[in-house]
Amino acid sequence: PGRGAAQLDAEVSVAGADGPGELVTMRLRGAMASHTASVALPLLIPDAPVVVWWASHAPKAPSQDPLGMLARRRITDASLAARSRAELQMHASQYAPGDTDLAWTRVTGWRALLAAALDRPHAPVVSAEISAVRSSPSAPLLAAWLHTSLGVPVSMHASRGPGITSVRLHTADGEISMTRRDGVKTLLSVPGYPTSEVSLRRRDTKDL
């Protein structure tokens, strides 16, 4: 963007695999890439909800970006950045209602599994730990959620991945653990119950 001759390539899809309605995909190059809001605005239907998703590099403050200002929901993906955790912290510092990062969406399965495990009778959780590849932006979000939900200290440890590989909750009766080594299956262990294998596949962006 911003280099070469100004160019606009567009593709229009009508009620197909992408869902009902019309989908317009535009690729802006050169100087035109600096005027995304001006290009998109004439295509918007008055009062219709607008969602902006930055499929690559996102602005520092999505809600203050000219294109982001047109949207009710702004979606970023910190995992695409070279320094993904720093990217997530930057977006958090500029957060505005309507901002969403896919790093949070990626922990939905973990949160559901943790909630199911904690639905069983158990001793109070006194601490927790998360293991994940060092660059994972989802791990600190899951840690913050656990800390807020349980009110206990949560430590993070580096692993070889992929992504988050384990969550352990420490109780007086033993350890509630969820371990995923291959990015697909997770072993769930709860004191007093047999260990079970649960599907917890790492989801592609298109599945989020």
Predicted regions and their residues:
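Extended, compositionally simple fibrous regions characteristic of intermediate-filament-like scaffolds
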Residues: 13-17, 81, 97-105, 121, ...
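ATP/pyrophosphate-binding catalytic subdomain of soluble kinases
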Residues: 102-156, 163-167
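A generic structural motif
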Residues: 1, 53-55, 77-81, 153-164
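Long, compositionally biased intrinsically disordered terminal regions
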Residues: 150-151, 163-165, 170-208
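Acidic, Ser/Thr-rich peripheral helices and adjacent loops at domain boundaries
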Residues: 9-14, 68-81, 168-182
